[in-house]
């Protein structure tokens, strides 16, 4: 994104936004208390989302909500009222359609007497930008907070044959694996078809696979998925094309 000319100013608090003839002036203060103004053409404000539970009259029937107006549920997605279940954006967790879909399946299985569950560690997140961004599992920051020792495998699309063939080589695949067991703990991708490639790593994590398991799986050539294999090889410094 920086290569595309986008500048990032982290930890800046917006104090005011004023319209002017050519656009807007944004007045900010950073964490050191220094003030800085930015002149811009357009202002896009992204403040997140909240559960759309207003108007459902949940309080009237006694459904319990948390401090953010999300419906409280147990591990089976059951509310405090036995025959009422809740899933998706109105409960705790990422507001993603595929997360809600898996929860819906789990609820149906539980109602049918089966043992439905959702593994939240393997729910991928995708940002549909150019280049595409995808992630799953833990980040390095989270692993450090958990005092989990880990290994990193990283491979650039610059060395991927398919990416070079279509002249789309921006980005990389990064895999995080447990330092002792080699179990895949997370992955982060930036580049072509990242949202598609993340599924392979999700399957690996769902079945407790190691980076070695991915590395020993034959990937067709030339494909973008070879970058995943190479990143897995790179965990033990065995990448072939980097």
Q: Where would I find each of the regions flagged by the language model?
A:
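FAD-site-proximal beta/loop scaffold in flavoenzymes
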Residues: 37-112, 117
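Short, surface-exposed charged micro-motifs
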Residues: 16, 62, 76, 174-176
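Rossmann-like dinucleotide-binding cores of NAD(P)H-dependent redox enzymes
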Residues: 1-29, 33-34, 93-101, 109-142
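Residue-level structural signal for beta-strand termini and adjacent loop
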Residues: 20, 85, 112, 189-190
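Flexible, glycine-rich terminal cap/loop adjacent to redox cofactors
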Residues: 129-139, 144-242
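Conserved beta-strand segments of alpha/beta enzyme cores
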Residues: 7, 64, 149-151
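Short acidic-glycine loop/turn motifs at beta-strand connectors
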Residues: 20-21, 67, 179-181
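Short gly/ser/thr-rich secondary-structure transition/capping motifs
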Residues: 23-29, 63-72, 158
